[in-house]
Design a protein with these regions (language model features):
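Conserved Radical SAM active-site core
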Residues: 32-69, 76-184, 188-196, 205-213
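Auxiliary Fe-S-binding modules of radical SAM enzymes
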Residues: 1-45, 51, 235-280
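Non-catalytic positions within long, well-ordered alpha-helices that form the structural scaffold/packing
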Residues: 150, 216, 245-248
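Short hydrophobic alpha-helical runs that function as membrane-insertion/retention elements
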Residues: 157, 223, 255-257
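A structural motif
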Residues: 153-154, 220, 251-252
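Short catalytic/ligand-binding loop motif for oxyanion handling, primarily in non-cytosolic enzymes
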Residues: 87, 132-133, 233, 263-265
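Conserved strand-turn element in the central/C-terminal portion of the radical SAM core barrel
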Residues: 190-192, 199-201, 214-236, 259-262
Length: 280
């Protein structure tokens, strides 16, 4: 098994200068298996798991859950990269390879949902980093999270690039019987070279679209978010047409599709010069 060769380290061992301040009490796991070599996971016990989104934001939701910080999907344009600097890590390589795992997320959520002050409001997931990144295959936090939401009949939505969502089909179906469940898969383009250049850790776009169709085949409402559309890279008529055709090929198996635009961030802007060389 690919997870059998992990190494368990104490954050108190080794060079303390390399351990972020927040991780002094974390369990640190590293891997020497293909696909995970160079990755570091910081297992922490979070104090809370449901975050409030300020009303001043233009988001359509007010509550979110993010069981991970950092993301192996390594999308170069990701707006959440800057949040890694708050943990004394960088927004580039560290964001892709040093992931914080909130191992007590399901337990915290159950407590929140049972608290007298909770009004059963909609909770959005996948809004910051992908909750179905590869680490989820090991930690399985989403199964506990979905089960908690199901048991409380609390409405929720998930946005992901991860085909691993199909693993939780059984729980999603059970949740959909008692509450509103909204699912979206992100796939803005189908160009293979572009995908490998700017979304190197994600499943292929075609696989994501197929995962969306499979969810619909099983009675769950799932749409494709054609986003983010990356300026100068995936916004040409040819690129957009190819993506629409791929989605349309699934026919009635896709409930809906809507576009979204990537907005420039400091890391996004700096990386664009590299993309020009990669894709030339």
């Amino acid at each position: 098994m690919r997870w059998d060769n992990l190494r368990l380290d104490s954050a108190d061992d080794g060079d303390q200068g390399q351990v972020p301040m927040f991780a002094r009490d974390a369990v640190v796991r590293t891997f020497d298996t293909p696909g995970f070599r160079g990755m570091t996971f910081y297992e922490v016990h979070a104090k809370s798991i449901v975050s409030h989104v300020p009303e001043s934001s233009r988001m359509s939701f007010r509550w979110t859950i993010n069981p991970y910080r950092g993301c192996q999907h390594s999308c170069v344009y990701c707006f959440a990269r800057q949040s890694h600097t708050y943990l004394d890590m960088d927004a580039g390589r560290d964001f892709d390879s040093r992931v914080v795992v909130k191992v007590n997320a399901p337990e915290l959520l159950r407590k929140k949902l049972a608290s007298p002050g909770w009004a059963g409001e909609h909770i959005a997931m996948g809004t910051n980093v992908d909750c179905y990144q590869r680490a989820e295959g090991r930690y399985q936090l989403m199964r506990g999270i979905i089960a908690a939401l199901r048991d409380a009949a609390n409405p929720f939505s998930i946005l992901t690039k991860g085909t691993l969502i199909l693993r939780d089909l059984d729980l999603l179906l059970e949740a959909a019987e008692v509450t509103d469940v909204g699912l979206n898969v992100s796939a803005a383009f189908v160009d293979t070279s572009l995908w490998r250049a700017i979304e190197p850790g994600t499943p292929a776009p075609e696989r994501r679209i197929e995962a969306c169709a499979t969810l619909n085949d099983n009675g769950l409402r799932c749409g494709v978010l054609m986003g983010p559309v990356v300026p100068y890279l995936s916004d040409s008529p040819a690129q957009l047409d190819a993506a629409v055709r791929q989605i349309a090929a699934a026919g009635e198996r896709i409930e809906r599709a809507c576009p979204g635009l990537a907005r420039p961030t400091p890391y996004f802007s700096a990386s664009s010069r590299t993309w020009a060389v990669i894709l030339a």
